[in-house]
Amino acid sequence: MSGAAARALPKAVTFVTGNAKKLEEVRAILGSSIPFQSLKLDLPELQGEPEDISKEKARMAASQVNGPVLVEDTCLCFNALKGLPGPYIKWFLEKTGHEGLNNLLLAYEDKSAFAMCIFSLALGPGEEPMTFVGKTAGKIVPARGPADFGWDPVFQPDGFDQTYAEMPKSVKNQISHRGKALALVKEHFAAANYKVQNDGSA
């Protein structure tokens, strides 16, 4: 597709999030490579397979903003629990806290887990979303480090003796599930060569 003409987007991509820490990470990873704005939308909480959830949220968001959107879904999957909590990690964390996440694995020797991040890009209403998936393997440990960003204190990636929360941001962003998924998003944008139209009205 290298000879294909660049597709014009009506406006900059809207990254849908109300999470300041998540937005900070995405900005740090993407830099100026992709022009985007952020917006908090109240999208219904869905159930199902992670990629299906992410795609449906992208469809709904694209309809709401009437333009290109990028949505993110994050999973934390415990291998001993056959992938749970998975996409429902947010609610598990809210209800049980970091100690509760560890307690889920008390009866199991296997503390291994993987973090997964799915970005879905819909170029506009009615457009089929594209997905970009990043995974990082690790294990669940008692909480260490700052407790200001989700489950970062209890996830220690393989090959490191620090949890996500203990790592310098620059290191985490290179090896994290979010960093890997966003690297694929950046590759797609570079290859697709999208052009954002500027009609001067905003």
From Swiss-Prot:
Keyword hit for Hydrolase: yes
Binding site for ITP: 17-22, 57, 73-74, 90, 149-152, 172, 177-178
Residues involved in Mg(2+) binding: 45
GO cellular component: cytoplasm
InterPro entries cross-referenced by the UniProt entry: ITPase, ITPase-like_fam, RdgB/HAM1
Official protein name in the record: Inosine triphosphate pyrophosphatase
Localization terms from the record: Cytoplasm
Keywords from the UniProt entry: Cytoplasm, Hydrolase, Magnesium, Manganese, Metal-binding, Nucleotide metabolism, Nucleotide-binding
SUBUNIT field: Homodimer.
Cofactor binding, note field: Binds 1 divalent metal cation per subunit; can use either Mg(2+) or Mn(2+).
EC top class named in words: hydrolase
